[in-house]
């Protein structure tokens, strides 16, 4: 499915109608604004293969755990994001005919997603079975300035038809979850109805009792003049709306503007949902499309001004990186610490809409570096608020004394994963949360978050590791047994190097910040010691002993770290040995065959070298990269950008570029042949990080911002903004490196080996070096 879409730096363009790509296209053209989102399905009914999906942030339902072999510690229930009632539905009816692109001839078709403006456009010329020709034009906005509003402008022009055209906007509560519950209805309709100008639909999930209410108003035009046709009210058990129509002749155009307000029990008292949604829908109708669209465009412009990356000479890369930033912001606004980012966002039900450690790996550093807003901090507060349940989760698995194991998958703090080799064994996820807290302190230069929240998390995670390690008498070292590392194609192994190493670094981080907070925030330190019942002398001694005597498997002859015990016993061969028709291997091979192979799903050892880069010299990184990357199939969306960053840092710029393209266009070119299920939202910031931390070589060392830029051969230059210690820098890389301080007073920056002082209004220009 590669290269189906047209290349355009600001637009995603589909210029033909291909029914066999429908579900994938629906994923690609998804829209959202962080409060709600919807797959890019047609507004009108479509009788062939389609996945109509709508999702509302923070609204979940309890689903019973389904496993073949129950094990102690599995969750009884877990939360999932439900496919919400459909707010976008608009039917188009002629005399005795209804538009259905699966049944009508599609004479021309063009769909465009304008990423700069955040607007989806669809144009088509269609012919009905009776020979009636129409032209369609549809615009769709998930309003970024008004997070409860969705706007749809639906226009139809008669080419050869004479007669009545009716447009039927409805709110449809008759939906199911097609991925997991195709035959079960998740929603109960509490109330639905219409007034003279408004329709509403009030619903509740069958389990967990979350509620949402939609309200809809509309305006109707004929040849650009508003027409007050007598609407027919539609009031059914699970639907509410109107049918509005008028007589047309060839050349006439009728337009319906649908204003939808979406209110949920996350933000409103339940008894106020109808009133709140109706008031907002009516206010939107009064404000009008043009003003609401402009406010929406302005909101997107603010995002692009902060986070935009400009790439010169490579439209495919430019399109891809903008698409990834666009979809991330469509999923997460960053203004509510009760919310997080699901791997599929609002583009599909897979993974239940829950949170993984992907957030801390990719999203937190992106938001820390790309915007001065406290978006990343809200993601960290989300984890802090779930600390009590993480402690309870660890207790269920036999840990005590306030040890915490954060869930592999969650939306409410409770574990929502039920594969034992992941749920119980992929425990390295704990370290990623501590690492993200460290990144926050490093990049903001502030300690308030750690003093008020983060240190409690660090203590609880360190207590987990204190109990999870074992002491090997033969080795006289601490070992960690029965784990799954980041490479999920290796399960239940001993001494995964990344897990062991990141455990050490986690304990070191906790000890370091205990000392810092004790000095700088003595009152907070005393409070934390009290509520955690910390025995500093005893516990710190234990943690230091683990750090000093942790076993780290390595191969001295090759000069590499060994991924885990037993890995070197495998037949070691590159991915070139895999037949082309058997990729991705997780779609063609048995699990037994995958486990016995040497093939690596995603960065494992190399992830540790990326996160703790300054602890290793360049040659060590190069040796490990050259050993492990050829055996990596990159079948996790988290993999390509990590490898791209490391490749750029060790001078393999063109290899870095190929991996960057993989990360950047993973969904647009459907690398993993699974785009029909939704997008890979939480790995999308990786493409931005690959530019900033990879090609630009941005790192923080000893409190100094450092860059070592390189440029792929295809590019003539690139530029981006970055935030550090409350300062905003604009960095341009071409034949020269130009750096300006656009916000802030003064900052030192190291470019290659030299340190320069930046001041606002005084740009810095440095010659770029060849580091290959």
Enumerate the language-model features and the residues they cover.
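Helix-terminus loop motifs that line ligand-binding clefts
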Residues: 332-347, 373-435, 441, 447-452, ...
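Gly/Pro-rich turn-and-neighbor structural signature
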Residues: 307-339, 343, 500, 526-566
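Alpha-helical scaffold segments in carbohydrate-active enzymes
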Residues: 323-330, 382-389, 456-468, 505, ...
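Acidic/polar, glycine-enriched structural segments that form the non-catalytic walls/loops
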Residues: 1-351, 589-593, 771-772
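The feature captures the catalytic groove of carbohydrate-active enzymes
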Residues: 347-355, 404-452, 463-542
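C-terminal capping/lid segments that line or modulate ligand- or cofactor-binding pockets
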Residues: 23-56, 60, 358, 362, ...
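Active-site core of glycosidic bond-cleaving carbohydrate-active enzymes
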Residues: 355-361, 365-384, 452, 508, ...
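Non-catalytic C-terminal accessory modules of carbohydrate-active enzymes
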Residues: 76-129, 134-135, 618-622, 629, ...
């Amino acid at each position: 499915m590669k290269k189906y879409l047209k290349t355009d730096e600001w637009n995603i363009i589909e210029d033909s109608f291909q029914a066999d790509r429908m579900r994938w296209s629906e994923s690609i053209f998804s829209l959202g604004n962080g409060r709600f989102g919807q797959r890019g399905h047609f507004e009108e009914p479509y009788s062939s293969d389609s996945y109509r999906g709508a999702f509302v942030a923070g609204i979940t339902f309890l689903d019973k755990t389904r496993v073949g072999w129950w094990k102690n510690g599995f969750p009884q229930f877990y939360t999932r994001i439900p496919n919400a009632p459909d707010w976008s539905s608009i039917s188009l009816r002629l005399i005795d005919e209804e538009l259905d692109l699966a049944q009508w001839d599609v004479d021309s078709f063009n769909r465009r997603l304008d990423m700069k403006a955040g607007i989806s456009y669809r144009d088509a010329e269609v012919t009905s079975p009776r020979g009636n020709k129409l032209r369609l034009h549809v615009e769709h906005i998930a309003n970024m300035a008004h997070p409860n509003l969705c706007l749809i402008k639906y226009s139809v022009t008669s080419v050869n038809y004479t007669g009545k055209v009716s447009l039927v906007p409805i709110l449809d509560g008759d939906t199911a979850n097609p991925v997991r519950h195709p035959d079960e209805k998740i929603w109960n309709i509490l109330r639905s109805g219409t007034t003279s100008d408004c329709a509403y639909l009030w619903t509740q999930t069958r389990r967990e009792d979350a509620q949402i209410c939609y309200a809809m108003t509309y305006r109707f035009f004929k040849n650009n003049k508003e027409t007050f046709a007598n609407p027919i009210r539609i009031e059914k058990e699970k639907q509410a709306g109107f049918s509005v129509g008028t007589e047309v002749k060839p050349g006439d155009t009728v337009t319906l503007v649908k204003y939808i307000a979406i209110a949920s029990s996350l933000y409103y008292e339940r008894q106020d949902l109808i009133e709140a949604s109706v008031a907002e829908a009516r206010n939107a109708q009064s404000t009008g499309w043009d003003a609401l669209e402009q406010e929406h465009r302005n909101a997107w412009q603010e995002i692009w001004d902060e986070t935009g990356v400009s790439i010169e000479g490579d439209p495919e890369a430019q399109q891809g990186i903008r698409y990834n930033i666009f979809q991330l912001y469509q999923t997460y606004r960053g203004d509510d610490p009760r919310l997080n980012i699901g791997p599929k966002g609002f583009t599909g039900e897979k993974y239940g809409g829950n949170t993984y450690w992907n957030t801390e790996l990719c999203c937190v550093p992106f938001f820390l570096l790309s915007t001065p807003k406290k978006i990343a901090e809200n993601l960290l507060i989300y984890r802090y608020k779930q600390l009590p349940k993480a402690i309870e989760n660890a207790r269920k698995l036999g840990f005590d004394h306030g040890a915490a194991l954060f869930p592999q998958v969650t939306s409410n703090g409770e574990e929502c994963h039920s594969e034992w080799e992941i749920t119980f064994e992929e425990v390295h996820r704990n370290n990623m949360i501590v690492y993200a807290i460290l990144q926050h302190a490093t990049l903001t230069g502030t300690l308030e978050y750690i003093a008020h929240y983060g240190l409690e998390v660090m203590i609880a995670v360190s207590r987990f590791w204190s109990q999870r390690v074992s002491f090997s008498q033969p080795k006289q070292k601490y070992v960690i047994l029965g784990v799954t590392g980041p490479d999920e194609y290796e399960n239940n192994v001993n001494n995964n190097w990344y897990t062991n190493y990141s455990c050490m670094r986690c304990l070191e981080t906790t000890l370091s910040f205990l000392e810092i907070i004790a000095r700088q925030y003595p009152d907070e330190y005393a409070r934390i010691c009290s509520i955690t019942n910390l025995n500093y002398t005893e516990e710190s001694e234990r943690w230091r002993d683990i750090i000093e005597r942790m076993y780290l498997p390595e191969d001295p002859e090759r000069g590499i770290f060994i991924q885990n015990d037993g890995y070197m016993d495998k037949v070691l061969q590159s991915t070139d040995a895999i037949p082309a028709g058997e990729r991705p291997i997780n779609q063609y091979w048995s699990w037994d065959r995958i486990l016995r192979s040497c093939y690596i799903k995603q960065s494992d050892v190399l992830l540790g070298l990326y996160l703790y880069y300054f602890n290793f010299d360049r040659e060590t990184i190069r040796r490990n990269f050259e050993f492990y990357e050829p055996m990596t199939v990159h079948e996790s969306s988290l993999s390509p950008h990590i490898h791209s960053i490391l490749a750029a840092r060790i001078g393999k710029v063109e290899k870095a570029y190929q991996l960057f393209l993989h990360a950047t266009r993973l969904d647009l070119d459907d690398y993993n042949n699974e785009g029909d299920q939704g997008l890979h939202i939480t790995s999308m910031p990786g493409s931005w990080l690959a530019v900033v931390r990879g090609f630009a070589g941005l790192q923080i060392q000893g409190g100094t911002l450092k860059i070592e830029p390189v440029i792929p051969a295809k590019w003539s230059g690139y530029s981006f903004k970055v935030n550090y210690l409350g300062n905003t820098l604009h960095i341009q890389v071409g034949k020269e490196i130009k750096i300006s301080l656009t916000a802030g007073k003064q900052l030192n920056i190291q470019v290659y080996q030299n340190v320069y002082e930046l001041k606002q209004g005084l740009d810095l220009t440095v010659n770029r070096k060849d580091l290959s």
